[in-house]
Protein backbone atom coordinates (compact mmCIF):
# COMPACT_ATOMS: atom_id res chain seq x y z
CA UNK A 1 0.00 0.00 0.00
CA UNK A 2 1.16 3.49 -0.65
CA UNK A 3 1.23 6.63 1.38
CA UNK A 4 2.67 7.62 4.72
CA UNK A 5 2.75 4.71 7.16
CA UNK A 6 1.75 2.11 4.57
CA UNK A 7 2.60 -1.50 5.42
CA UNK A 8 4.93 -3.58 3.29
CA UNK A 9 3.21 -5.36 0.42
CA UNK A 10 2.12 -8.89 1.27
CA UNK A 11 1.20 -11.56 -1.27
CA UNK A 12 -1.49 -13.51 0.58
CA UNK A 13 -2.03 -17.28 0.34
CA UNK A 14 -4.72 -17.57 -2.33
CA UNK A 15 -4.93 -21.30 -3.10
CA UNK A 16 -8.42 -22.16 -4.30
CA UNK A 17 -9.75 -18.60 -4.11
CA UNK A 18 -12.10 -17.05 -6.63
CA UNK A 19 -11.75 -13.32 -7.31
CA UNK A 20 -14.03 -10.95 -9.20
CA UNK A 21 -13.27 -7.41 -10.32
CA UNK A 22 -15.92 -4.85 -11.24
CA UNK A 23 -14.73 -1.66 -12.92
CA UNK A 24 -16.49 1.40 -14.27
CA UNK A 25 -16.24 2.63 -17.84
CA UNK A 26 -16.01 6.34 -16.94
CA UNK A 27 -12.47 7.76 -17.31
CA UNK A 28 -11.39 4.69 -19.29
CA UNK A 29 -7.68 5.56 -19.35
CA UNK A 30 -7.66 5.51 -15.55
CA UNK A 31 -10.02 2.59 -14.93
CA UNK A 32 -8.24 0.47 -17.53
CA UNK A 33 -4.97 1.10 -15.66
CA UNK A 34 -6.62 0.27 -12.32
CA UNK A 35 -7.94 -2.96 -13.83
CA UNK A 36 -4.53 -3.85 -15.24
CA UNK A 37 -3.00 -3.33 -11.79
CA UNK A 38 -5.67 -5.51 -10.21
CA UNK A 39 -5.08 -8.32 -12.70
CA UNK A 40 -1.29 -8.12 -12.24
CA UNK A 41 -1.74 -8.32 -8.46
CA UNK A 42 -3.96 -11.40 -8.76
CA UNK A 43 -1.36 -13.07 -10.98
CA UNK A 44 1.53 -12.07 -8.71
CA UNK A 45 -0.33 -13.48 -5.70
CA UNK A 46 -0.59 -16.82 -7.51
CA UNK A 47 -4.32 -16.94 -8.12
CA UNK A 48 -4.88 -20.07 -10.21
CA UNK A 49 -8.08 -19.02 -11.97
CA UNK A 50 -8.24 -15.75 -13.84
CA UNK A 51 -10.45 -13.24 -12.04
CA UNK A 52 -13.95 -12.66 -13.37
CA UNK A 53 -14.08 -9.13 -14.81
CA UNK A 54 -17.28 -7.11 -15.19
CA UNK A 55 -17.52 -3.55 -16.53
CA UNK A 56 -20.34 -1.21 -15.46
CA UNK A 57 -21.45 2.23 -16.55
CA UNK A 58 -20.46 4.26 -13.51
CA UNK A 59 -19.61 4.26 -9.83
CA UNK A 60 -23.21 4.13 -8.60
CA UNK A 61 -23.58 0.73 -10.27
CA UNK A 62 -20.61 -0.77 -8.42
CA UNK A 63 -22.37 -1.86 -5.18
CA UNK A 64 -25.18 -3.88 -6.77
CA UNK A 65 -22.80 -5.71 -9.10
CA UNK A 66 -20.31 -6.26 -6.27
CA UNK A 67 -23.15 -7.82 -4.25
CA UNK A 68 -24.01 -10.20 -7.08
CA UNK A 69 -20.35 -11.16 -7.51
CA UNK A 70 -19.84 -11.62 -3.75
CA UNK A 71 -22.37 -14.45 -3.81
CA UNK A 72 -20.01 -16.52 -6.00
CA UNK A 73 -16.50 -15.32 -5.13
CA UNK A 74 -14.16 -15.25 -2.14
CA UNK A 75 -13.21 -11.61 -2.76
CA UNK A 76 -14.37 -8.76 -4.96
CA UNK A 77 -12.53 -5.63 -6.08
CA UNK A 78 -14.43 -2.47 -7.06
CA UNK A 79 -12.62 -0.01 -9.31
CA UNK A 80 -13.74 3.42 -10.45
CA UNK A 81 -13.05 7.12 -10.56
CA UNK A 82 -15.18 10.00 -9.31
CA UNK A 83 -13.84 13.49 -10.03
CA UNK A 84 -15.13 16.49 -8.08
CA UNK A 85 -17.14 18.92 -10.18
CA UNK A 86 -18.89 22.17 -9.41
CA UNK A 87 -21.98 20.65 -7.78
CA UNK A 88 -22.71 18.46 -4.72
CA UNK A 89 -23.15 15.45 -7.05
CA UNK A 90 -19.60 14.30 -6.24
CA UNK A 91 -20.42 14.07 -2.53
CA UNK A 92 -23.63 12.12 -3.12
CA UNK A 93 -21.98 9.64 -5.46
CA UNK A 94 -18.99 9.09 -3.17
CA UNK A 95 -21.20 8.58 -0.12
CA UNK A 96 -23.51 6.17 -1.97
CA UNK A 97 -20.68 4.09 -3.39
CA UNK A 98 -18.69 3.95 -0.16
CA UNK A 99 -21.71 3.00 1.96
CA UNK A 100 -22.92 0.53 -0.66
CA UNK A 101 -19.62 -1.30 -0.92
CA UNK A 102 -19.25 -1.39 2.87
CA UNK A 103 -22.73 -2.89 3.09
CA UNK A 104 -21.82 -5.58 0.56
CA UNK A 105 -18.72 -6.48 2.57
CA UNK A 106 -20.60 -6.75 5.85
CA UNK A 107 -23.81 -8.36 4.56
CA UNK A 108 -22.08 -10.96 2.37
CA UNK A 109 -19.05 -11.41 4.64
CA UNK A 110 -16.92 -11.20 1.51
CA UNK A 111 -14.16 -8.59 1.32
CA UNK A 112 -14.60 -5.88 -1.28
CA UNK A 113 -11.35 -4.13 -2.14
CA UNK A 114 -12.04 -0.41 -2.44
CA UNK A 115 -10.30 0.82 -5.56
CA UNK A 116 -12.60 3.77 -6.20
CA UNK A 117 -10.58 6.94 -6.63
CA UNK A 118 -12.36 10.01 -5.27
CA UNK A 119 -10.25 12.91 -6.47
CA UNK A 120 -10.43 16.64 -6.95
CA UNK A 121 -8.73 16.47 -10.36
CA UNK A 122 -8.08 14.03 -13.18
CA UNK A 123 -4.35 14.52 -12.54
CA UNK A 124 -4.74 13.23 -8.97
CA UNK A 125 -6.56 10.16 -10.30
CA UNK A 126 -3.88 9.50 -12.91
CA UNK A 127 -1.21 9.68 -10.21
CA UNK A 128 -2.98 6.90 -8.27
CA UNK A 129 -3.92 4.66 -11.21
CA UNK A 130 -0.70 2.75 -11.83
CA UNK A 131 -0.06 4.50 -15.13
CA UNK A 132 3.55 5.07 -16.24
CA UNK A 133 4.82 7.82 -13.95
CA UNK A 134 2.08 7.30 -11.34
CA UNK A 135 3.16 7.36 -7.72
CA UNK A 136 0.58 4.76 -6.69
CA UNK A 137 -1.30 1.74 -8.05
CA UNK A 138 -4.62 1.63 -6.23
CA UNK A 139 -5.92 -1.24 -8.40
CA UNK A 140 -3.09 -3.44 -7.17
CA UNK A 141 -3.48 -2.26 -3.58
CA UNK A 142 -7.23 -2.89 -3.49
CA UNK A 143 -6.77 -6.37 -4.94
CA UNK A 144 -4.08 -7.43 -2.51
CA UNK A 145 -6.11 -6.03 0.40
CA UNK A 146 -9.21 -7.99 -0.68
CA UNK A 147 -7.25 -11.22 -1.15
CA UNK A 148 -5.44 -10.77 2.17
CA UNK A 149 -8.74 -10.23 3.98
CA UNK A 150 -10.23 -13.28 2.26
CA UNK A 151 -7.24 -15.33 3.45
CA UNK A 152 -7.70 -14.08 7.02
CA UNK A 153 -11.43 -14.91 6.92
CA UNK A 154 -10.64 -18.38 5.60
CA UNK A 155 -8.13 -18.93 8.42
CA UNK A 156 -10.65 -17.75 11.02
CA UNK A 157 -13.30 -20.11 9.67
CA UNK A 158 -10.86 -23.03 9.68
CA UNK A 159 -9.88 -22.23 13.27
CA UNK A 160 -13.54 -22.59 14.24
UniProtKB/Swiss-Prot annotation:
The biological pathway it contributes to is: Cofactor biosynthesis; riboflavin biosynthesis; riboflavin from 2-hydroxy-3-oxobutyl phosphate and 5-amino-6-(D-ribitylamino)uracil: step 1/2
EC id: 2.5.1.78
Q: Name one GO cellular component term.
A: riboflavin synthase complex
Residues bound to (2S)-2-hydroxy-3-oxobutyl phosphate: 86-87, 128
- Listed binding positions for 5-amino-6-(D-ribitylamino)uracil are 26, 59-61, 81-83, 114
InterPro entries attached to this UniProt entry: LS, LS/RS, LS/RS_sf
One GO molecular function term? 6,7-dimethyl-8-ribityllumazine synthase activity
Q: Where does the record place the catalytic residues?
A: 89
Q: Which SUPFAM superfamilies match?
A: Lumazine synthase (SSF52121)
CDD domains registered for this protein in UniProt: Lumazine_synthase-I (cd09209)
Q: Which NCBIfam families match?
A: lumazine-synth
Q: What does this protein do?
A: Catalyzes the formation of 6,7-dimethyl-8-ribityllumazine by condensation of 5-amino-6-(D-ribitylamino)uracil with 3,4-dihydroxy-2-butanone 4-phosphate. This is the penultimate step in the biosynthesis of riboflavin.
Query: What name does UniProt use for this protein?
Result: 6,7-dimethyl-8-ribityllumazine synthase
Q: What is the lineage of its organism?
A: Bacteria, Bacillati, Actinomycetota, Actinomycetes, Frankiales
Amino acid sequence: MSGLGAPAEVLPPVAGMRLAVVATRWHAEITDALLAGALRAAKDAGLAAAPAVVRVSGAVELPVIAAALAARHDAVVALGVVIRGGTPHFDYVCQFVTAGLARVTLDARVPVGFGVLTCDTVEQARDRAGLPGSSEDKGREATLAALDTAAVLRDLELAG
